[in-house]
């Protein structure tokens, strides 16, 4: 049974390699590979409360990683609890872009495609949490 096409698997592997240090530094999630269902995002911050999400596309993997980095910028886990997501301030957005771009630029041959995806992701993120008030 083939879970991914060769092309998709290469993209996922390249993303994972670029984000490897970031993922290794986090103690509350991991991305593992299963021969049966492919890459899986596992939440591991509370033993027994682990949740899992199948990452079936490069975009699904990036969505989770981008969201995690954004949450980390808005509310670092060590100091605050993220009660409610909100639109990013200019400085938060700049910090998120800086952190994510530095990682994406390590992806051979795919950086431009993923940087465009980051632009779309942040735009969607801002619209999602704008709550009707256009600033």
Model-derived regions: residue spans:
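Negatively charged, low-complexity tracts enriched in Asp/Glu with abundant Ser/Thr
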Residues: 1-26
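Compositionally biased, intrinsically disordered low-complexity regions
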Residues: 9, 21-23, 37, 48, ...
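Acidic, low-complexity, intrinsically disordered interaction modules
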Residues: 28, 32-120, 124
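Short acidic DE-rich linear segments
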Residues: 130-135
